[in-house]
From Swiss-Prot:
InterPro entries: Na-dicarboxylate_symporter, Na:dicarbo_symporter_sf, Ser_Thr_transp_SstT
GO cellular component: plasma membrane
Mode of membrane association: Multi-pass membrane protein
Short name of any one Pfam family annotated for the protein: SDF
Name under which the protein is recorded: Serine/threonine transporter SstT
Topology, Cytoplasmic side: 2-15, 67-83, 164-179, 239-299, 353-414
Main location group: membrane
Top-level taxonomy: Bacteria, Pseudomonadati, Pseudomonadota, Gammaproteobacteria, Enterobacterales
UniProt source species: Escherichia coli O6:H1 (strain CFT073 / ATCC 700928 / UPEC)
Length: 414
């Protein structure tokens, strides 16, 4: 007589959902960092390899997907890029506005004693926009090597339109190459639990969170504002678009995109994850192959919050009065700066001096604010990236679902 044994914990995890495997990796990473710091630092290599693999595959994935979708686009077939772009810009401005309200409700101050003399921020918003435009005319090989997604998008779109006039064999080859790269991406994503395990272990072992307690209130305002945008503002925008309960979609995007982005701390590395989620949601490939890399470049709600909150914290510290029109102008400036954050080395933090300049704050003090940003960066950057990246796929899904509903209603009326 044979007896049936219930599958063990390891077997259940191995054959369970990827989210459960990531949660297991997270818990094991925390335990290892608590038990042995040297061992935790050593397994950090696993996290570095995982993030490196995602960053390596993301540029070629964007190039091939966008090129294939445009080359094989059928005449008359509609994409939803325009409404998604509008949602990106509206979401970023709404986040900056929420950050202003949050900062007025819970004013924070800083200990401006750190220095950051070795960092060179852009001198003005014109320089930020110039860098963004110049990245469009980058050499394609250089764009792929450096992960310049604006340049990659421009070349992919141009080549895609050119290949529309090619023969079917060429189009099929491009499509097959796109599928091959997608397969490689899925392979890399399967190693996410191991990567998260390494990232969490090394972060807790090398950095810890003791330095963050000195900036507890500032972090509460920053993270609280990001949670407000993720769980209140974004759902309102999605409801406005799809006219039904937005929370199943919002929570799905936070769980399956935001969790990855929180630990990788890279919107570029999360592009393959978002692409896979869009495929899982059965969204239009012609749309998401363009909107996801575009969102990783310009959809920066988290960056807008960081710029606004830290700037107003500096303003409060120096006792500078701020009226309502100035606060609204700061929201606009923070939104524009956030959209250009991908074109600046150091991202949102190095755009803080631009916003500080509005209030006549000297560059020396502004750079001390940037230094504070780097101190709290362990948590701030993780939350910012999670919000930015999950919003890319959220707004893409909302626009695609709204278009599907419109077509279905139109078919019923006819």
């Amino acid at each position: 007589m044979t007896t049936q044994h219930s599958p063990g914990l390891f077997r259940r995890l191995a054959h369970g959902s990827l989210v459960k495997q990531i949660l297991a990796g997270l818990i094991l990473g925390i335990l290892l960092a608590w038990i042995s710091k040297p061992a935790a630092e050593a397994v950090g290599l696993l996290g570095t390899l995982f993030v490196g693999a995602l960053k390596a595959v993301a540029p070629i994935l964007v190039l091939m997907l966008v090129m294939a979708s445009i080359a094989n686009h059928q005449h008359g077939q509609k994409t939803n890029i325009r409404p998604i772009l509008f949602l990106y810009l509206l979401g970023t401005f709404s986040a900056a506005l929420a950050a202003v309200i949050f900062s007025f409700a819970f004013p924070s101050t800083l200990h401006l004693s750190s220095s950051a003399d070795d960092i060179s921020p852009p001198s003005g918003i014109v320089e930020v926009m110039r860098g963004l435009v110049m990245s469009m005319v980058s050499n394609p090989i250089d764009a792929l090597l450096k992960g310049n997604y604006i340049g990659i998008l421009v070349w992919a779109i141009g080549l895609g339109f050119a290949l529309r006039h090619g023969n079917e064999t060429t189009k099929n080859l491009v499509n097959d190459m796109s599928n091959a790269v997608t397969f490689m991406v899925k392979l890399v994503i399967h190693f996410a639990p191991i990567g998260i395990f390494g990232l969490v272990s090394s972060t807790l072992a090398t950095t810890g969170f003791s330095t963050l307690w000195g900036y507890a209130q500032l972090l509460v305002v920053l993270v609280g504002c990001m949670l407000l945008v993720a769980l209140v503002v974004n759902p309102l925008l999605v409801w406005w678009k799809i006219r039904r309960n937005p929370f199943p979609l919002v929570l799905l995007c936070l769980r399956e995109s935001g969790v990855y982005a929180f630990f990788t701390r890279s919107s570029a590395a999360n592009i393959p994850v978002n692409m896979a989620l869009c495929e899982k949601l059965n969204l239009d490939r012609d749309t998401y192959s363009v909107s996801i890399p575009l969102g990783a470049t310009i959809n920066m709600a988290g960056a807008a919050i960081t710029i606004t909150v830290l700037t107003l914290a500096a303003v409060n510290t120096l006792g500078i009065p701020v009226d309502l029109p100035t606060a609204l102008l700061l929201s606009v400036v923070a939104s524009l700066c956030a959209c250009g954050a991908s074109g600046v080395a150091g991202g949102s933090l190095l755009l803080i001096p631009l916003a500080c300049n509005m209030f006549g704050i000297s560059n020396d003090i502004a750079m001390q604010v940037v230094a504070v940003g780097f101190i709290i960066g362990v948590l701030q950057d993780s939350c910012e990236t999670a919000l930015n990246s999950s919003t890319d796929v959220l707004f893409t899904a909302a626009a695609c679902q709204a278009e599907d509903d419109r077509l279905a209603n139109s078919a019923l009326r006819n």
